[in-house]
Amino acid sequence: MANSDSGDKEAHRSSKHGGWITLPFMLVTLLGMSITYFGWVMNLIVFLIEEFNIKSIAAVQISNIVNGVVNMLPVVAAILADSFFGNIPVISASAFISLTGISLLTLIASLDYLRPRPCETGSILCQSPSKLQLGILYAALALVITGTAGTRFILASAGANQYKKPKEQGRFFNWYFFTLYGGAITGTTAIVYAQDNASWKLGFGLCVAANLISFIIFVAGKRLYEHDQPLGSPYTSLVRVLVAATMKRKAVISYKDEDYHHRELEKETKTYVAMPSKSFRFLNRAALKTEGDSNNNMWRLCSVQEVEDFKAVLRLVPLWTSVMFLSAPLAVQMSMTVLQAMVMDRKLGPHFKVSAGSMQVIALVSGCVFIILNNWTTYPMYQKLIRKPLTPLQKVGIGHVLTILSMAISAVVEAKRLKTVENSHLMSVLWLVPALVINGIGEAFHFPANIAIFYGEFPESLRNTATSLTSVVMGISFYLSTALIDVIQRTTKWLPNDINHGRVDNVYLVLVIIGVSNFGYFLVCSWFYKYRNLKNDDHEQDLKDVTN
């Protein structure tokens, strides 16, 4: 009877909180925050060059570092959400911090004394920004970076938590990615156009408006959300497994179920297992009952579920590193595309000139379109012909191939551009389009699939971390791209400040080599990887719904 009452209360609570009524609040928040983020970050290189008189390659490096930090910090936000505050308060606080940062950027664009004097036309010697000016700029960037990091990927977890069924979570992820790309496209076109053709003050001011609306809408829907309850740090259990296994490293591993420790509540979880798996067998000692063990000493005796959760994280590490080297070439291409566009003919007709920072919108539009096409046509047609769905890893593999192809096309186009420059002509910026389109198609395959893999395969207690892990991978990839550009600049003459006298085509060829090597590594990793949550047809269908 007590259990029945408890179930009724749970059902009543679920009917009042969460569900599809929360979708508009989540999506409007995501849309506004995406417009804000892409509105300032996509044109950051141009802003640093034109408004702070920073050299082109130095501006690229600063942009890569900024992108790295903004993609690394979500894991910190995820830890705060999982361990202490829950994801709803973290998103609210982060949206406000972002609003403070973008407001400060707007002030910098509005007040002349917060920027160095602009270079005179044709002048080589330009006034460098003062320490105070750089300090205020970096403070603004730090605030808006922190705010962005605590919203984008935590919103994915918070939104998915509003639904109980994997199929509904899958539909939410579709809306999430569509809205994310929609905000990115709006920020990269409308906001960047306003910055280049009206003023930086107007462009950043529009970002302030978008951020403010996001913050108000999200807070307004707070009473409707299903709030997750932080249960203390889930990372402690991972450390405890390692400590317990080390303490009992001399114990003989048993093959009997009764020799291993279980907790009653774990039997209700979807991933419950009676016996520890054979992989990473040395960790099984953490759950092995030995003389002197006490159920109260969790640093010496862990449960089988905790051991298997730790193994699940370890199994994903090779895939995690392969995604990292998949994203690094994309980060370099993103930066180089802006520099290339700045020295190309950007006129489309007699009155319209494309913004250099807006060129990346082509990849975003391509990705958005092909996410829809994949879900509506490509994946259903494949399943109809082959009689089984594309797995998430197969989708990531297709993304690898398309990324390599994109880099190869970029190399060919840049080689042609340099020959055109030798003849004192400007090549049309439209030559950059094919590589960017293929880049976007590749992202439509690998980006949602990676999110689905990490969300579906991570332990339930680390779900916020799971969705932010893709962002961390992207962050590390930006640092790798920064290191790669630095090495190339130090060891070759391919990347001078004036790329018309460089060999960016050779940089792209290096990226092709990295991509091919990483694809081989990915094939090996995916061959040995076994899905944790694809043990039967139902689970396979669930993850297919999340990915598609």
UniProtKB/Swiss-Prot annotation:
A Pfam family that the UniProt record links to this protein: PTR2
GO biological process assignments: chloride transmembrane transport; nitrate assimilation; oligopeptide transport
Summary of the function given for this chain in its UniProt record: Transporter involved in a passive nitrate efflux.
Gene name of the record: NPF2.4
Family: Belongs to the major facilitator superfamily. Proton-dependent oligopeptide transporter (POT/PTR) (TC 2.A.17) family.
Keyword Nuclease: no
One Gene Ontology cellular component annotation held by this UniProt entry: plasma membrane
Organismal lineage: Eukaryota, Viridiplantae, Streptophyta, Embryophyta, Tracheophyta
Record protein name field: Protein NRT1/ PTR FAMILY 2.4
